[in-house]
Amino acid sequence: MTEDGPGSQDTSDLAGQVIELLRAAGQTVAVAESLTGGLVAAALTTIPGASLAVRGGVVAYATDLKAALLSVPQRMLDEHGAVYPAVASAMAVGVRQRLGATFGVATTGVAGPDPQDGQPVGTVHIAVSADDDTVVRTLALDGDRDRIRRLTVDRSLALLLGRLREDIR
């Protein structure tokens, strides 16, 4: 992965491959973002033809919006905070169901400069949800706020791309 971030060749290539596979399969994606603040959706919608594959996105930056808009259980948020693997999973499921997409992608984590919910800067959880399963990955990323956010976008797109390729096999 490159450090150039959304709009970089790697990000564009990943997003392009995702859109191509979604379109070929007649499938769609919806995105729920916290620390990336819409960057995953922006990377996807930069690709021509994305309107046939991207249902939309929700930027639930505030913790209470994760419950209100994405059906993340309030109890989970109260007990664990927003930076927790099961929160990423619930966000991905929630956005997929709420926006009526084949796949849901979610990002939550700590971009910095300060720790959050007892988690150090660079702790990130990403998830991809489909009807039959939800996959969550925990990342420990280094760098400043911008680099952590850029890497999260690339890793999220790569996780979705991997899931799409599994469907082809």
Model-inferred region functions:
Residues 1-169:
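Short alpha-helical segments enriched in small residues
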